[in-house]
């Protein structure tokens, strides 16, 4: 197919007549627009080389990029590949191209388009008004000469955006790669005629880029000289915002003279610098003209304050090759070296402060070696249709290719481990199928014309379909379950409405017909938010749904310099001449400063008090040493850049080993604990070993986990419904079958989670607990129905800000908020809590109408909490230079006490020198504390605490009365059995049950008591406590006396409401469901019947609606179709008994630790005081209320003294956990560590540290310096950073069928890194739960979509909620990245426009043993 219409106006018929009408939609003939080679930046290796071309390439190094519509972006692209039909050498020298170097050669029957990658694309001759379409490159080339294109043409609307003179000129050509534009205008430079010329000069046989025009008619113009030595060259650019740039050009003679003058002034002998250059190179004809510098000469927003230096400057070799690049500060940032024999052939390059990478070529000009002195080197061997790549670790990869020139594709890849993957392509090089190493094939169906994917079929036959409008914009996506995503656009192609699969509608409004920036958005709640923009497309103000405004200031380079929020809250940023962030100042003037090395790595963070956090880097910018407060951590890497050893502050080591595919295969911890991992051909984890504990992982055909076996016995089992949605997880815990069951509505939203526990022998149901969720008409999850409680309804305003809470029909809590939507007043009956904030936004006070509970907070310049004052006492806190809590000074009327906290360098608790001056302990190298002032400790080989015994001081006569605590664990390192003995007699024994997710669902406790014979022994019958959960939050505790249920503040682990119901009252509430009642009496003979599950689900929904007095129209229609009424069904329902309940409000501190329980009458029914680590100091409990919640996420176990903390058990006496972190080093280097500043940080999951209940990430101390102490890998682009993050987590996301998300951060040197991913839900994640560390800037976000096993088409595209996140001005991110189940890597900008879409991410289930 030629990419031309089947019948073209101007073509001749068989009988000689010309065609006057043609079809613009049907294309015929041989392919047109085929490139001479594959894209240089496509398949790359190392630093980088394109092995398909055998070329050294440097894709897209950007020197200038100011914000604005149609901005002038000066980027350099290098390729050593030489096309047979090159365009002339551009102003960056041989081998280099920039966007302005696009050129069209006009030959007799051929058009040759030279792109900015150094390639040639071949098109057939075009008649006026005709177009050619390259299906392999997705590129249109159109010749002017008509006022309109055919109405059915995809470019018809974009064509009309052009000025009429351009459309009508048959001598101009235009190119675009999208129906949304922009157009690249290909014209000629008007030459000034000579004095003796009478007739106009003939047009040249080529066209050059003269400008761009977008679909709004905005233009970017390249000004070319009409005469003189630079005739035809670009000497100026006017961008779409009317900024003017001057391009300073030089000739070879001028550069030679400048070199001679510099030598003379420097007193040196001039080097050989010829006045002329050869007129031809392997990269095309060369006129010797080079770009010397680019100046900004006019800026409409800053007309009086133009830069005093060029934005970029270039230096040249005597042979006219690009030698150096200087940034706008005048500092050299790049250098290049070229072959002595072949002009323009790059043999080395370096970034300033980085090692030099060198290259060797064969006689055909192909790269054969890539030499890296501080990392991996590569060799390349070329054979016909085969390229072998071998790195310096002797790992070999073989690429098998098919096709020629621009259609060459890798069809088979042999990996270093011997596995093979294969790909299939259509005739124009578009991917049709991929087969993984296990032989499973995923098929892709591209549209025959556009190449857009219309269908994806996975190996198990599941398919997703995508639909587009005539402008190639996605209009709907439909999956096997029939749910649909829909998008609508206006006539300019701007998104105006999106309907998500769950029915959630978002609308976008525009007030400027010449802009794609929305002026307002409306969400499903009807809330409207407005935005104003600068002429450069920068956000100036954002007005939320309440009319509150946030304003933004920027500098001319697009960097944000200030943010002004309501309530007087502002932040100011300062940058150096390189654009690196050097200072951040808050409203109160507290300033944090930043320092960098020559390579731009952040080397120091100076806090407002002058303390420094320092980081040292290796040659490639990887952190090798971090120092804070005299404590140092170090990291070592191998040649492949993989971490191979960590050295803690104590000098201990953790080591890592990898396989040939860079997968972790062994980890040996600081304490010697060794874990090993084995993978199958597709990379899935199939076996893990943990000090002899062997686990096997089993998967189904869709790569979903089906079960695990541990020590040969079945552990967890996963079950899925026909849609692939997870419905059940079960396992055996202490002989009991424990399961979790999930229910969803017709839109795939979670509506119920039920835990069940069955008897080991009889399988009788011992316990079940269900939490249900409901959604309002706008799709907000605003209702939760706890087990055996009325519905909890969250009252919101605007886009979901919390305004109140109801239990059933009873309003319980009301909130008042300030102009930042922060809580300022909370009301619960007579109880009122008033909250105030400092000018910097920190908590300043919490005052109650009960003065004794008032609290005032004081912070130091570093943002550390240093004092909490109340009417009863004042506590002052001191910290080390590493941010660790070192002491507490408590003063009151009759009290003045100082309590010190001492730790070794790694954060392990030590005896305090003041209290124990004779102690010689200085550190615990393996982080296993063996003794303290009170106990001796023993651990097993997994690092689990197994025994704790009373310490008998030296000199004390032993009486064998010491108490011994013993701890026993299951294969998942969960505590399942605890005993405490004295005189070798048991005092207490307890056993614990867990569900498959690791949540504790029951405990049984036997206590020592006197039996009928008078002997003391453990009770025969245990005290049994059952637990119920809603996600990761413990909501129900029930024993034989009462049930206590907790309602938490939304999105946190801070308890809000406590509901207690006597067990006897609960028994009266037992009733049949409507479905059960109908089934038991539904037979014709009066006997029972069994309803199908779908009918049971519909009846359950109807019953919940009747009980809530909110019967939906859908349910009424369904009943009517059955000849029934709501009243009839209501008469079939068992009566509802409302039990007597005690309701209290939790009054908590700033962390979420309960301080008091307030009755509905406003009285304090219980109150307590704790130390900083959660130890109970005092308690007033006149009503004998059971209040077991401690620090957020923790439950006190009276029998052991430990706090259950979701994934682990916390020992408050030591301020640490008794087992190692299940997520390994992701939770911090000390695997036992709780946060070392418990005044500000919490850890509600027993995993990684949280700064507070809302953020969910550790940002203090060294963690704040590097985010993750292994030292986050840093990149030069957001794109590369996001790809790295998603490449690491996409497999695990597929395994768990959960979304993961995090942020992309920009450090002060302008480099990027990702924060650690946090787990979301099956259909939702929130990247801001993993915030950027202090001193860095969030610029983007990334997330995954889990597994596509449930057939949801939108797993492959951005959802409406995704787009809300990126478009929200509150979030202030530039883009949002997505890793899909099929391995697609996608991105949209903050206007919802797709900016990246390519394959390459893992698309099979692989998990890390620690996870």
From Swiss-Prot:
Q: What is this protein called?
A: Protein RhsB
Where do the sequence repeats lie?
Answer: 330-352, 353-374, 375-417, 418-438, 439-460, 461-481, 482-502, 503-525, 526-546, 547-567, 568-588, 589-609, 610-629, 630-650, 651-671, 672-691, 692-711, 712-734, 735-758, 808-828, 829-850, 851-871, 872-894, 895-930, 931-959, 960-984, 985-1019, 1162-1186
Any idea which UniProt keywords this protein has? Repeat
Phylogenetic classification of the source organism: Bacteria, Pseudomonadati, Pseudomonadota, Gammaproteobacteria, Enterobacterales
PANTHER family per the UniProt record, alphabetical: PROTEIN RHSA-RELATED, PTHR32305
Q: What's written under domain?
A: Each rhs appears to consist of a highly conserved 141 kDa amino fragment followed by a highly divergent C-terminus.
What does the sequence similarity comment in the record state about its family?
Answer: Belongs to the RHS family.
Function (record text): Rhs elements have a nonessential function. They may play an important role in the natural ecology of the cell.
Q: Which InterPro entries match?
A: DUF4329, DUF6531, RHS, Rhs_assc_core, RHS_domain, RHS_repeat, T6SS_VgrG/RHS, YD
Q: Where does the record place a coiled coil? A: none
């Amino acid at each position: 197919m030629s990419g031309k219409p089947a019948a073209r106006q101007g073509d001749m018929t068989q009988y000689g007549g010309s065609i006057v009408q043609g079809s613009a939609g049907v294309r015929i003939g041989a392919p047109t627009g085929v490139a001479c080679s594959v894209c240089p930046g496509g398949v790359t290796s190392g630093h980088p080389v394109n092995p398909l071309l055998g070329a050294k390439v440097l894709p897209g190094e950007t020197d200038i990029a100011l914000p604005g519509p149609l901005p002038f972006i000066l980027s350099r692209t290098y390729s050593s590949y030489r096309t047979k039909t090159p365009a002339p050498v551009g102003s960056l020298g041989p081998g280099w191209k920039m966007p302005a170097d696009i050129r069209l050669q006009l030959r007799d029957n051929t058009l040759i388009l030279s792109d900015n990658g150094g390639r040639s694309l071949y098109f057939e001759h075009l008649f006026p008004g005709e177009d050619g379409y390259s299906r392999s490159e997705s590129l249109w080339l159109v010749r002017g000469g008509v006022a309109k294109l055919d109405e059915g043409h995809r470019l018809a609307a974009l064509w009309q955006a052009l000025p009429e003179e351009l459309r009508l000129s048959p001598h101009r050509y235009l190119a675009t790669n999208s129906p949304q534009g922009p157009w690249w205008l290909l014209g000629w430079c008007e030459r000034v005629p000579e004095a003796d010329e009478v007739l106009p000069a003939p047009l040249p046989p080529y066209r050059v880029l003269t400008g761009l025009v977008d679909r709004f008619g905005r233009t970017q113009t390249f000004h070319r000289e009409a005469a003189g030595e630079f005739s035809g060259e670009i000497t100026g650019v006017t961008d779409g915002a009317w900024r003017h740039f001057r391009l300073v050009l030089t000739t070879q003679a001028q550069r030679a003279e400048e070199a001679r003058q510099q030598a003379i002034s420097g007193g040196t002998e001039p080097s050989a610098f010829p006045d002329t250059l050869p007129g031809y190179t392997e990269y095309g004809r060369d006129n010797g003209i080079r770009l010397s510098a680019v100046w900004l000469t006019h800026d409409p927003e800053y007309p009086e304050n133009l830069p005093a230096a060029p934005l970029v400057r270039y230096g040249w070799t005597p042979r006219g090759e690009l030698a150096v690049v200087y940034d706008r500060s005048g500092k050299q940032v790049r250098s290049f070296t070229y072959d002595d024999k072949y002009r323009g052939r790059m043999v080395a390059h370096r970034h300033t402060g980085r090692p030099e990478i060198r290259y060797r070529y064969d006689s055909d000009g192909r790269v054969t070696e890539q030499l890296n002195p501080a990392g991996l080197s590569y060799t390349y061997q070329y054979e016909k249709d085969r390229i072998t790549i071998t790195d310096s670790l002797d790992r070999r990869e073989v690429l098998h290719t098919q096709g020629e020139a621009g259609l060459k594709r890798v069809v088979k890849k042999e990996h270093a481990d011997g596995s093979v993957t294969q790909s299939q392509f259509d005739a124009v090089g578009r991917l049709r199928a991929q087969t993984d190493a296990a032989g499973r094939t995923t098929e892709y169906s591209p549209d025959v014309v556009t190449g857009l994917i219309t269908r994806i079929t996975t190996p198990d036959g599941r398919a997703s379909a995508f639909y587009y409008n005539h402008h190639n914009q996605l209009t709907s996506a439909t999956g096997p379950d029939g749910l649909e995503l829909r998008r609508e656009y206006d006539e300019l192609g701007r998104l105006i409405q999106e309907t998500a699969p769950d029915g959630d509608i978002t609308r976008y409004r525009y007030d400027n017909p010449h802009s794609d920036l929305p002026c307002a958005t409306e969400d499903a709640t009807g809330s409207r938010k407005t935005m104003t923009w600068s002429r450069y497309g920068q956000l100036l103000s954002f007005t939320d749904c309440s009319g509150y405004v946030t304003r933004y200031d920027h500098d001319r380079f697009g960097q944000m310099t200030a943010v002004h929020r309501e309530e007087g809250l502002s932040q100011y940023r300062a940058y150096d001449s390189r654009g690196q962030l050097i200072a951040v100042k808050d409203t109160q003037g507290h300033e944090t400063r930043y320092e960098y090395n020559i390579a731009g790595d952040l080397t120091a963070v100076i806090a407002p008090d002058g303390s420094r956090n320092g980081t040292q880097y290796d040659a490639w910018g990887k952190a090798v040493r971090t120092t804070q407060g005299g404590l140092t951590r170090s990291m070592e890497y191998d040649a492949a850049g993989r971490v191979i050893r960590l050295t803690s502050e104590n000098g201990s080591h953790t080591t890592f080993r990898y396989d040939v595919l860079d997968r972790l295969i062994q980890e040996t911890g600081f304490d010697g604990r060794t874990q090993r991992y084995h993978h199958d051909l597709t990379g899935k984890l199939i076996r893990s070993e943990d000090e002899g504990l062997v686990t096997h992982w089993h998967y189904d055909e869709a790569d979903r986990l089906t079960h695990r076996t541990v020590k040969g016995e079945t552990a967890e089992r996963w079950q899925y419904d026909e849609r692939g949605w997870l419905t059940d997880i079960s396992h055996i815990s202490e002989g009991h079958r424990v399961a979790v069951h999930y229910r969803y509505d017709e839109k795939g939203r979670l509506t119920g989670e039920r835990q069940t526990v069955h008897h080991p022998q009889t399988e009788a149901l011992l316990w079940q607990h269900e939490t249900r969720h409901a959604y309002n008409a706008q799709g907000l999850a605003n209702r939760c129905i706890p087990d055996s409680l009325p519905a909890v309804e969250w009252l919101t305003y605007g886009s979901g800000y919390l305004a109140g809470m109801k239990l059933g029909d009873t309003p319980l809590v009301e909130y008042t908020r300030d102009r930042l939507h922060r809580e300022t007043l909370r009301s619960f009956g007579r109880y009122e809590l008033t909250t105030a904030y400092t000018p910097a936004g920190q908590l300043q006070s919490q005052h109650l109408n009960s003065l004794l509970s008032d609290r005032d907070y004081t912070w130091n310049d570093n943002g550390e909490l240093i004092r909490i004052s109340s009417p009863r006492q004042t506590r002052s806190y001191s910290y080390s230079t590493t941010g660790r809590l070192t002491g507490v000074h408590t003063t009151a009327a009759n009290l003045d006490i100082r309590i010190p906290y001492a730790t070794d360098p790694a954060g392990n608790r030590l005896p305090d020198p003041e209290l124990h001056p004779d102690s010689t302990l200085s550190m615990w190298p393996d982080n296993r504390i063996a003794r303290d002032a009170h106990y001796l400790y023993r651990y097993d080989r997994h690092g689990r605490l197994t025994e704790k015994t009373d310490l008998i001081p030296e000199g004390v006569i032993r009486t064998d009365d010491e108490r011994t605590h013993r701890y026993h664990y299951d294969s998942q390192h969960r505590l399942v059995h605890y005993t405490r003995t004295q005189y070798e007699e048991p005092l207490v024994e307890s056993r614990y049950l867990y569900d498959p997710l690791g949540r504790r669902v029951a405990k049984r406790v036997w206590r020592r008591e006197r039996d009928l014979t008078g002997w003391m022994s453990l009770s025969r019958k245990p005290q049994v406590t059952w637990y119920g959960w809603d996600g990761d939050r413990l909501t129900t505790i029930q024993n034989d006396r009462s049930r206590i249920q907790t309602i938490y503040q939304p999105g946190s682990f801070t308890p809000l409401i406590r509901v207690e119901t006597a067990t006897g009252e609960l028994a009266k509430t037992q009733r049949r469901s409507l479905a059960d009642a109908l089934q038991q009496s539904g037979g014709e003979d009066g006997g029972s019947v069994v309803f199908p599950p779908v009918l049971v689900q519909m009846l359950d929904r109807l019953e919940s609606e009747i009980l809530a007095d909110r019967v939906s129209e859908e349910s009424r229609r369904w009943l009517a179709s059955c000849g029934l009424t709501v009243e009839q069904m209501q008469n079939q329902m068992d009566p509802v008994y409302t039990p007597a309940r005690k309701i209290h409000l939790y009054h908590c501190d700033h962390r979420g630790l309960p301080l008091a329980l307030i009755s509905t009458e406003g009285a304090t029914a219980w109150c307590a005081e704790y130390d900083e680590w959660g130890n109970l100091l005092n308690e007033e409990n006149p009503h004998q209320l059971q209040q077991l919640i401690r620090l957020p996420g923790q439950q006190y176990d009276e029998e052991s003294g430990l706090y259950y903390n979701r994934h682990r058990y916390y020992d408050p006496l030591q301020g640490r956990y008794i087992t190692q972190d299940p997520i390994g080093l992701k939770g911090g280097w000390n695997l036992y560590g709780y946060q070392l500043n418990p005044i500000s940080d919490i850890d509600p999951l027993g995993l990684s540290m949280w700064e507070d209940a809302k953020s969910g990430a550790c940002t203090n101390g060294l963690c704040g310096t590097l985010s993750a102490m292994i030292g986050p890998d840093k990149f030069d682009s957001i794109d590369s950073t996001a790809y790295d993050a998603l490449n690491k987590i996409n497999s695990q996301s597929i395994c768990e069928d959960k979304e993961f998300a995090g942020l992309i951060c920009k450090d002060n040197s302008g480099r990027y890194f990702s924060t650690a991913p946090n787990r979301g839900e099956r259909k939702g994640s929130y990247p801001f739960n993993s915030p950027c560390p202090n001193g860095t800037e969030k610029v983007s976000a990334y997330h995954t979509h889990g597994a596509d096993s449930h057939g949801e088409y939108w797993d492959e595209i951005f959802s409406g909620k995704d787009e809300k996140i990126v478009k929200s001005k509150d979030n202030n991110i530039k883009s949002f990245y997505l890793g899909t189940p099929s391995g697609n890597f996608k991105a949209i900008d903050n206007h919802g426009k797709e900016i990246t879409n390519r394959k390459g991410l893992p698309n099979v289930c692989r998990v890390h043993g620690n996870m």
